[in-house]
From Swiss-Prot:
3',5'-cyclic AMP binds at residues 732-736, 773, 890, 941. GO terms for cellular component: synapse. Pfam families: PDE4_UCR, PDEase_I. It is an enzyme of class 3 (hydrolase). Pathway: Purine metabolism; 3',5'-cyclic AMP degradation; AMP from 3',5'-cyclic AMP: step 1/1. PROSITE patterns: PDEASE_I_1 (PS00126), PDEASE_I_2 (PS51845). SUPFAM superfamilies: HD-domain/PDEase-like. This is 3',5'-cyclic-AMP phosphodiesterase. A divalent metal cation 1 binds at residues 736, 772-773, 890. The record marks 893 as: Binds AMP, but not cAMP. Residues 51-69, 166-210, 1025-1042 have a biased composition (Low complexity). The gene is dnc. GO terms for biological process: anesthesia-resistant memory; associative learning; axon extension; cAMP catabolic process; cAMP-mediated signaling; chemical synaptic transmission; circadian rhythm; conditioned taste aversion.
Length: 1070
């Protein structure tokens, strides 16, 4: 089988051309050629810059050489029909070709003056007569593309290239003549290779019939757009999944490809696909068989190329992607007019990865290369197919800027998973819950996938939220029922985007099961088990709770289980577990548990009475002094002089007067960058970081104009707001507010969220980030509740500080010259106020697990439903995403570069220690992690990341994949750093104070134990370990051993405090 190399004629002039790279091979789809046949796929390869200059100079050096190339290309593209007809067509079209070449010479001179380039080449493909190709740069794409596309298609392509100077677009159409031009050598040269494959020629009758049917389909109001909309997620998934190999290769090349991949993956979108359809629809010649669009990008030394080919007969849509030497092909077969059940997607991968890639990445990164499911089979003979559903064509769910704008949900690549994906073995699970995935792959391929794909964690989109598991189980029951009964599926009662065909069932269509077969019996048994599990789960749902509460309760239960094991490891582990439980778990569900009334339990009454007498004095000492009248909002100061200080026409460039304006402007120019030097901004802004950050962000987003906010009023309010942040707080000050606001701005810029939220929603989220900690006293909610503060009484112990922040902020808006929303309509103002209240209340850390469960349930439910698109078409869904976005920004310190993260950790711990000092002085119990004499910072950060931060960012990354992969990588690196910094466990501190007393008590305690346990405990006593609580009379060596994992507790010993955490280990007798 002949293979023609790509890249144009050989360079002449005595200069030796660079040797061509070895071709990459893939297996073509079985419907096209024999499965054993291999062909080259180097048609998108980019040559070296030197070779590009040589090729261009020789190709356009003379008219004769250009004529030869065009004539040869034309003869290749005219291979159909009989020999006589072919020669006649060649003769006629060669004359026309030569005439057009003369016109091209004139066009060439004009373009040389403009320093731009349009290169025209030709290529041939199997089962289609090829055409010419036009390559255009952004400056000339309109005039170039107008020759083969309509004006609207050319405009859309030009708009795509507006901000992509390094991108080239190739569009082709089958009956256009070949043209060629040249320009400056600085423009990259893209050559289209050719490969002739046996496949036969289509007769003229069938071609004309196909053309008529295709044009008729395109003329339908919602035909083509609806079909492409339904497949939009697959198109994006194809391009993005190819980036996995590009990321892997980047590790070898020493470059990071994420930015390159992210830019390239956004190129194939609604506009470009629509351009391809329009290109194909404009073809009128009966010999034309299709149109194509190709995209090429080169960044960071890596090359990303993608192409789409739509055949004229609507039989296939073929997409190819080439990234860093890795090529992948995807084919949508079945045609536009085929029933949804007959449409298939086939994905083929390279046969071989680069030599040594896997081993090198394992050594460099400690994990295997990313390998998304359904995209890259392990061998050349493994093909993955999944059904393509016929989505709604009335409105694209990807349309931005509207209340119905949605998010395309992607599959996460392999990475370290959080505890949410571990087995909840204490409770009954669905029989298939551990292998259930997002209903993309057919059931019959599950075993094949499991045997091929290795080292991929939860790459199958493992479902962990109970409601999504119930939906998946019911879908499985429905599909199994279709197989068992052989009843044809009816889609009358199903929404179009959730229609299930017979091919979704456990058995492929055309192979029904008959009663009495072993497979029939096994499938029936599995179906009954699945249905029983669904019924059990539904029976436990409480009617007054939402379905996301099921996930919240499950996650809290799993977290308690994890922390129980964590607390048993050491004294510090117990303290960290208690801190996490008391801070991040809302314990409201405890009131729903059945319990005895106090008066029904005399022993409990007596114990409470004794405890009350002992704590009466302590309560009196810890109670906060009487504050201002509760009818007033505490913390609101009198209007300061700066409220009316901006009297001149000129406002400060960045909202603050500073002698270091140039340095400040340089840093503020990076406000869209994750991990900005926020501490330097605070220094250069004369301790006004919140004002300058907020003002710059609102200016750059044009929110002052769209929300009709007077700039002077905005600066007045921000200055007043910043004055109400307590500067003496080490952590909760205006610098923290500026950091959260800047992080919120970056997350709002996520490509997946582009055009999703309105300016009012964006402004509300940023405003909420600005005010979310105003007048923070540097104390926790639990401290305020325990000390019976005026704030806790005012807000009934519920989100005390968050309610106070909102009250202070909205009260400040009433100051003269500070109402930034004065020009809004009443309805808009009410909507924004509600949004801000919801977002700020969600920053209460005790609501963390509920927020996480709500978001994960929403994402997984949409994936199980089969739509793959999260339609944010109601307030609840939209505010839920914004709440989690700001919550992520509030917990973003561990995801920042390590120097910033370490500095934030030091400030937060100092604030905790100050609260602990205050608790010690008041005779109160010192809160977890607040005792400066007994804290392990490194281990606390590892636990904080493992149980709180990583599960949250993991879910967010699932929502906006792949836009948060860099953040997750940084988080894992920071976690590994603190893990490596954990000091070795010290010996028990209480043993040295009175070793003889501890030894005696230890021996007396073990008299009732057998000799084996005695020997084990004595070994543990000699080896030492971390003790539990120090400095108390109830501390025993047995409890110290328990803390070190040496066994049970000792008699008479007092167990460690377990705060607000349920299911903590209680050290009882053996």
């Amino acid at each position: 089988m002949s293979q023609e190399s790509n890249g144009g004629p050989a360079a002449g002039g005595g200069a030796a051309a660079a040797p061509p790279p070895p071709p990459q091979y893939i297996i073509t789809t079985p419907s096209e050629v024999d499965p054993d046949e291999v062909r080259s796929m180097a048609d998108l390869e980019l040559g070296s810059p030197e070779k590009q200059v040589q090729v261009q100079s020789q190709k356009f050096s003379s008219t004769s050489s250009t004529t030869k190339v065009a004539t040869h290309s034309f003869s290749m593209s005219s291979s159909a029909g009989t020999t006589g007809q072919q020669s006649k067509q060649d003769s006629a079209q060669q004359i026309q070709q030569l005439q057009q070449l003369q016109q091209l010479q004139q066009l060439q001179q004009q373009q040389q003056q403009q320093q731009s380039q349009r290169i025209i080449s030709s290529s041939t493909r199997s089962q289609s007569l090829q055409s010419s190709t036009i390559v255009g740069e952004a400056t000339t794409i309109t005039s170039g593309a107008a020759q083969i596309l309509s004006a609207s298609a050319a405009a859309s392509l030009a708009q795509q290239l507006k901000a992509q100077s390094s991108t080239s677009i190739i569009t082709s159409s089958e009956q256009r003549t070949s043209t060629s031009t040249s320009s400056s050598s600085s423009t990259r040269y893209i050559a289209s290779g050719s490969s002739n494959l046996a496949g036969g020629n289509s007769n003229s009758a069938s071609s004309a019939s196909s053309k008529t049917r295709f044009q008729s389909f395109l003329q339908q109001p919602e035909g083509a757009h609806g079909f492409l909309t339904a497949h939009q997620k697959h198109v994006r998934q194809f391009v993005r999944s190819t980036s996995a190999h590009s990321e892997a290769a980047a590790g070898v090349a020493g470059a990071r490809a994420e930015k390159c991949i992210r830019s390239a993956s956004t190129q194939i979108d609604d506009a470009s696909v629509a351009g391809v359809v329009e290109s194909a629809g404009n073809l009128t010649d009966s010999s034309a068989t299709g149109g194509s669009m190709q995209l090429s990008m080169s960044k960071l030394g890596l090359q990303q190329s993608s192409s789409i080919l739509i055949s004229k007969s609507a039989e296939t849509i073929e997409m190819k992607s080439s990234s860093a030497g890795m090529r992948t092909q995807l084919t949508l077969s079945g045609g536009f007019l085929a029933p949804p059940g007959n449409r298939k997607i086939t994905i083929l991968s390279p046969i071989h990865a680069p030599p040594g890639l896997h081993d090198m990445l394992k050594r460099a990164q400690g994990r295997s290369p990313l390998s998304p499911r359904i995209s890259f089979p392990g061998s050349d003979s493994d093909l993955f197919g999944f059904d393509v559903e016929n989505g709604q064509g009335a409105r694209s769910p990807l349309e931005g800027g509207s209340p119905s704008a949605g998010l395309v949900l992607q599959n996460l690549p392999q990475r370290r998973e959080s505890f949410l994906y571990r087995s909840d073995s204490d409770f009954e699970m669905s029989p298939k819950s551990m292998s259930r995935n997002s209903s993309i792959a057919s059931e019959r391929f599950k075993e094949q996938e499991a045997s091929i794909l290795v080292d991929r964690s939860h790459g199958e989109d493992l479902i962990v939220t109970p409601f999504a598991q119930i939906l998946a189980s019911l879908r499985s029951v429905r599909n199994n029922l279709l197989s068992l009964t052989n009843v044809p599926a009816s889609n009358k009662s199903r929404r179009p985007n959730q229609s299930s065909s017979a091919s979704r069932s456990g058995n492929p269509p055309g192979a029904p099961l008959s009663q009495g077969e072993e497979a029939y019996t096994r499938l029936a048994t599995d179906t009954i088990e699945e249905l029983d599990w669904c019924l059990d789960q539904l029976e436990t749902i409480q009617t007054h709770r939402s379905v996301s509460d099921m996930a919240s309760l499950k996650f809290k239960r799993m977290l308690n289980k994890e922390l129980s094991h964590f607390s048993e490891s050491s004294r510090s582990g117990n303290q960290i577990s208690e801190y996490i439980c008391s801070t991040f778990l809302d314990k409201q569900q405890e009131f729903d548990l059945p319990s005895l009334r106090v008066e029904d339990n005399p022993e409990l009454v007596a114990a409470n009475a004794a405890a009350g007498q002992q704590s009466a004095g302590q309560y009196a000492r810890s109670r906060s002094p009487r504050g201002p009248p509760m009818s007033q909002i505490s913390g609101v100061k009198r209007p300061l002089s700066h409220t009316n200080s901006f009297t001149g026409e000129r406002l400060p460039t960045f909202g603050v007067e500073t002698p270091r304006e140039n340095e400040l402007g340089t840093l503020l120019g990076e406000l869209d960058t994750w991990g900005i030097q926020i501490f330097s901004i605070g220094e250069f802004s004369v301790n006004r970081p919140l004002t300058c950050v907020a003002y710059t962000i609102f200016q750059s987003r044009e929110l002052l104009t769209s929300l009709m906010i007077p700039p002077k009023t905005f600066l007045n309010f921000m200055s007043t707001l910043e004055d109400h942040y307590v500067k003496d707080n080490p952590f909760h000050n205006s610098l923290h507010a500026a950091d959260v606001t800047q992080s919120t701005n970056v997350l709002l810029n996520t490509p997946a969220l582009e055009g999703v939220f309105t300016p009012l929603e964006v402004g509300g989220a940023l405003f909420a980030a600005c005010i979310h900690d105003v007048d923070h006293p540097g104390l926790t909610n639990q401290f305020l509740v325990n000390s019976s503060s005026e704030l806790a009484l005012m807000y009934n112990d519920e989100s005390v500080l968050e309610n106070h922040h909102l009250a202070v902020a909205f009260k400040l808006l009433q100051n003269q010259g500070c109402d930034i929303f004065c020009n809004m309509q009443k309805k808009q103002r009410q909507t924004l106020r509600k949004m801000v209240i919801d977002i700020v209340l969600s920053t209460d850390m005790s609501k963390h697990m509920s927020l996480l469960a709500d978001l994960k349930t929403m994402v997984e439910t949409k994936k199980v439903a089969g739509s793959g698109v999260l339609l944010l078409d109601n307030y609840t869904d939209r505010i839920q995403v914004l709440e989690n976005l700001v919550h992520c920004a509030d917990l973003s310190n561990p995801t920042k570069p390590l120097p910033l993260y370490k500095r934030w950790v030091a400030l937060l711990m100092e604030e905790f220690f100050l609260q602990g000092d205050k608790e010690r002085e008041s005779g109160m119990d010192i809160s977890p992690m607040c005792d400066r004499h007994n804290a392990t910072i490194e281990k606390s950060q590892v636990g904080f990341i493992d149980y709180i931060v990583h599960p949250l960012w993991e879910t967010w990354a699932d929502l906006v994949h792949p836009d948060a992969q860099d953040i997750l990588d940084t988080l894992e690196e920071n976690r590994d750093y603190y893990q490596s910094m954990i000091p070795p466990s010290p010996p028990p501190s209480g043993v040295d104070e009175n070793p003889q007393e501890d030894r005696i008590r230890f021996q007396v305690t073990l008299e009732e134990s057998d000799q084996e346990n005695l020997a084990e405990l004595e070994e543990g006593d000699e080896s030492g370990g971390e003790s539990t609580t120090t400095g108390t009379t109830g501390t025993t060596a047995a409890s110290a051993l328990s803390g070190a994992g040496g066994g049970g507790g000792g008699g008479g010993g007092m167990a460690p405090r377990t705060g607000g955490c349920q299911n903590q280990p209680q050290h009882g007798g053996m």
